[in-house]
């Protein structure tokens, strides 16, 4: 009888233990419930988790100071060791909101070591299994390639104190669909968001003064982008392959657009360049096949080679420059010479016709570059011809912009409502 009771008690105990474990472990043995570990001293995380359990935890929260030793352990749990070899780690969700990164410990990635309040270079590089990450509140900087290749990351919370995002910081984080950039950020490095094809919208902080080289290459999902007023330069390759962009408002202070800056942005339909623009770089808008209308400001002096090559959808170009800009080779190759009409300031027709504009375009029309007239009230002149913005002859006023030629030889751009 005693043996039967003992056996029954043992089975009951085992049942209770298995029931408790089921709260933490999934069918595949992974621990899905958040595990919270509070560290009394930096560098002690490896002492708190056994070598077996570290590969079973999928959701981890750390409280306290962490250094390079701890970060190396976290990387192993997230699928990559310190020399970027893959591990059996399955960590998916990481909450460091109550943690503080401090200097010290061993290297976490080759020769990379932790610094106080910095997400260091390549801190989470290659950890593609991470899906959600909350950073420590005190972080001020995100280093080079810090999240490079974290393609599974869909949720990332950046603390308010960050002022700098370095080169390649979010390189190919293709799973990110949105990201709130703190207002205090003043620098975004080269290729910082290259390959973030999942991003659909992004608002850059007011302190940003330039778009760095290659910062948004192949962000093909980006449909909306808000650029701060303080930006003065868009560097080369900044938005190559951002085919989802349909419209873009460039800040008034921009003076230069770098080479290949918007190459392959085939979704853009119209573009007005700010008055301060003087130079358009080589291949800046190459392959923007969706572009139908282009406005070049009065101060434009140079249009780089192949700048608008392949912009096959262009039907109208308004040039406000009294002095004909210098045009590089093949600047408008691929634009339909018959379909596209170039509108130039009054009195400059001959200059433009004799220039490279006359080589690329058959239809050059003078217009009043001083502004848009809503109506024509003068009784001294009569309308003799009317055209649409793409150069087609109109028999009557048509809603939208009309190009009207008068008996005194003047041409005006008229808005018809």
Where are the model-predicted features located?
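Boundary at the C-terminal end of the N-terminal hydrophobic targeting segment
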Residues: 23-27
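Structural signature of tandem-repeat unit edges
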Residues: 32-40, 58-66, 84-118, 128-141, ...
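C-terminal tail/sorting-segment detector
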Residues: 401-417
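Bacterial N-terminal signal peptides
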Residues: 11-22
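Bacterial N-terminal signal peptides that target proteins for export
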Residues: 2-12
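Consensus positions within tandem repeat domains that build extended binding/scaffold surfaces
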Residues: 120-125, 143-148, 166-171, 189-194, ...
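Short, T/G/N/S-enriched strand-turn elements that build extracellular solenoid repeat scaffolds
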Residues: 43-53, 69-79, 326-334, 394
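Residue-level detector of functionally pivotal "anchor" positions at catalytic/ligand-binding pockets or at interdomain
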Residues: 367-390
């Amino acid at each position: 009888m005693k043996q039967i009771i003992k056996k029954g008690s043992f089975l009951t105990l085992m049942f209770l233990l298995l029931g408790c474990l089921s709260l933490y472990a999934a069918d595949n043995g992974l621990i899905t419930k958040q595990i919270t570990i509070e560290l009394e001293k930096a560098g002690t995380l490896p002492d708190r988790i056994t070598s077996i359990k570290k590969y079973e935890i999928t959701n981890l929260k750390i409280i306290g100071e962490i250094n390079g030793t701890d970060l190396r352990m976290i990387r192993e749990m997230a699928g990559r060791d310190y020399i970027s070899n893959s591990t059996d780690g399955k960590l998916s969700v990481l909450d460091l909101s109550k943690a503080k990164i401090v200097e010290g410990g061993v290297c976490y990635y080759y020769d990379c070591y932790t610094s106080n309040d910095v997400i260091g270079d390549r801190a989470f590089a290659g950890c593609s299994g991470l899906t959600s990450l909350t950073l420590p509140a005190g972080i001020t900087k995100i280093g080079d390639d810090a999240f490079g290749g974290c393609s599974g990351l869909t949720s990332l919370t950046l603390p308010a104190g960050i002022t700098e995002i370095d080169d390649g910081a979010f390189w190919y984080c293709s799973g990110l669909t949105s990201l709130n950039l703190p207002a205090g950020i003043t620098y975004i490095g080269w290729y910082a968001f290259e390959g973030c094809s999942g991003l659909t919208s992004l608002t850059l902080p007011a302190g940003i003064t330039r778009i760095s080289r290659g910062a948004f290459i192949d962000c093909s999902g980006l449909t909306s982008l808000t650029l701060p007023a303080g930006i003065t330069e868009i560097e080369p390759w900044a938005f190559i392959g951002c085919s989802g962009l349909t419209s873009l408002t460039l800040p008034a202070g921009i003076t230069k657009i770098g080479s290949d800056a918007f190459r392959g942005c085939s979704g853009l339909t119209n573009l007005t360049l700010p008055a301060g623009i003087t130079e358009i770089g080589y291949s800046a808008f190459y392959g923007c096949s969706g572009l139908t209308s282009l406005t070049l400001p009065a101060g434009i002096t140079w249009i780089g080679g192949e700048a608008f090559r392949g912009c096959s959808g262009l039907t109208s170009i308004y040039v406000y420059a009294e002095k004909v800009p210098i045009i590089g080779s093949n600047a408008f190759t691929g634009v339909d010479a018959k379909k596209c009409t170039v509108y130039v300031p009054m009195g400059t027709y001959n200059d433009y016709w004799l220039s490279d504009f006359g080589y690329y375009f058959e239809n050059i029309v003078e217009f009043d570059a001083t502004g848009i007239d809503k109506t024509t009230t003068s009784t001294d002149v009569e309308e003799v011809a009317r055209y649409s913005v793409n150069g087609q002859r109109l028999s009557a006023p048509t809603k939208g912009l009309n190009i009207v030629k008068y008996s005194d030889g003047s041409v005006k751009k008229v808005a018809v409502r």
